[in-house]
Amino acid sequence: MSDRTIINSPEFAQAGTVLRGTLAVSEMKRLRDVLYDDAGTLEFCVQGECDARGRPRLRLAVNGVMHLRCQRCLESIAHAVDIATELRLASEAELGREIDPEEPGDIIPADVALDVGTLLEDEVLLSLPLAPHHAVGACDARPASGEGSKPGPFSALARLKKD
């Protein structure tokens, strides 16, 4: 999906349109800080529909694998992306109203020029772990050289206290 796909989200939902494709991880610029490398692609499906009350919705599904940087050892860790979410499209007037907590899914503005790539990137960012890391013991994280051999900053105080 190197060319940005722009949809009129209310019309897309009303028509029940389905958009499928792949998105290269390298195209998601806001992910660069957490990625180990930008290899791979994510498959996506965006489906428009209306709920029982006639309100437009988008169903998103994103699947694939990307390589994040482990925060323990700074090496690569494979992260499976498996997103299935529902977004209700709301007009400007609806956005100002009280939100029903029983309502499933999130609410986004109904946009006549919605960038699908940006929407998918937003969902991937929201699904990422706060601090990606390998399982305990599976990581090659080692203390920095010399760490542990240098006395702590309060060791002199501990000696004075003993005297």
Language-model segment annotations:
Residues M1-G16, T41-E43, A78-D163:
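Charge-rich, low-complexity linker and terminal segments
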